[in-house]
A protein has these predicted regions:
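Catalytic cores of alpha/beta
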Residues: 72-99, 111, 178-215, 230-235
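Structural preference for beta-strand elements that scaffold enzyme active sites
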Residues: 2-6, 46, 74-78, 98-101, ...
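Conserved, mostly hydrophobic/aromatic
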Residues: 8, 39, 47, 79, ...
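Glycine-rich, proline-tolerant flexible connector loops at the mouths of alpha/beta enzymes
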Residues: 46-62, 104, 163-172
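N-terminal active-site wall of soluble small-molecule enzyme domains
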Residues: 41, 48-95
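C-terminal helical cap(s) of enzyme catalytic domains, especially alpha/beta-barrels
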Residues: 111-117, 122, 207-218, 224-245
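Conserved anion-binding
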Residues: 15, 19-23, 97-169
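Charged helix-capping and loop-helix junction motifs
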Residues: 60-67, 139-148, 173-182
Length: 245
């Protein structure tokens, strides 16, 4: 199981939002590439990055920062936020991104996912309040069901689902283990969990999660790392221990 340390970029800064609220932002640094390099040096096998400005507007104004991360680190980079067209995805791939995460556009235009999946690594990012999927930087609820949407992409050729429980994001109060178990039971596509991780025990609960013989591909952690609840190296060790037991 892989750790995906998170770098959320807004106005060129490394930030975290609380429950996806743009008015509840904490700034942790002004150099995303430096932060990514620090994560990689501690043993992160991937970096997860979100362009918060693009998630809201679709304008990839942080593309230069993302390209700088890709150039700086020697590990794969997974990036989401505002990927709503073929050209937007291609700009990220051209910038050195390994895997693009399509969220709002996947929900509103599923054919885009099917068009892009043969061209490069694509993950579908599904962000939900409970089972109600939200889009446009989490600011609009769609009324679409999380599990029905996951099932609808079963034959789309995607590399992964990135599933975020918005109510837990940035809270450090623990992941939605039961909900994630249901996700695992719904799809054979690899699943990356996001939202709520605040302790090493939370990570252990995810390592031990299994449904229909499937386990999580990875977990995204952000605030817990920035608030020094644990280090990247500690988290990687816990996830590796779990994989070996």
């Amino acid at each position: 199981m892989k750790l995906y340390p998170a770098i959320d970029i807004r106005d060129g800064n490394c930030v975290r939002l609380y429950q996806g609220d743009y008015n509840r932002e904490t700034v942790y640094g002004d150099n995303p590439a430096d932060q990514a390099a620090a994560f990689a040096n501690e043993g992160a096998a991937w970096i997860h990055c979100v362009d918060l400005d693009a998630a809201r507007s679709g304008d990839q104004q942080n593309l230069a920062s993302i390209a700088a991360i890709a150039e700086r680190v020697g590990v794969p980079l997974q990036v989401g936020g505002g990927v709503r067209t073929v050209d937007a995805a291609k700009r990220l791939w051209d910038a050195g991104v390994t895997r693009v995460v399509i969220g709002t556009a996947a929900v509103q235009n599923p054919d885009l996912v099917r068009e892009l999946a043969p061209q490069g690594e694509v993950a579908v990012g599904l962000d939900a309040w409970g089972t109600d999927i939200a889009v446009a930087g989490w600011e609009e609820r769609t009324g679409k069901d999380l599990f029905e949407t996951i099932a609808s992409f079963s034959d789309a050729g995607v590399a992964a689902f990135v599933v975020t429980e918005i109510a837990r994001d940035g809270t450090m109060e623990g992941p939605d283990v039961d909900g994630l178990a249901r996700v695992l039971a719904t799809t054979a596509v690899p699943v990356i969990a996001s939202g709520g991780v605040g302790t090493l025990d939370h990570l252990r609960s995810l390592v031990g999660l299994e449904a229909k013989g499937r386990t999580l591909e990875g977990v995204i952690a952000g605030r817990a790392i920035y608030e020094q609840a644990f280090t990247v190296s500690q988290a990687v060790a816990v996830l590796q221990e779990g994989a070996e037991t």
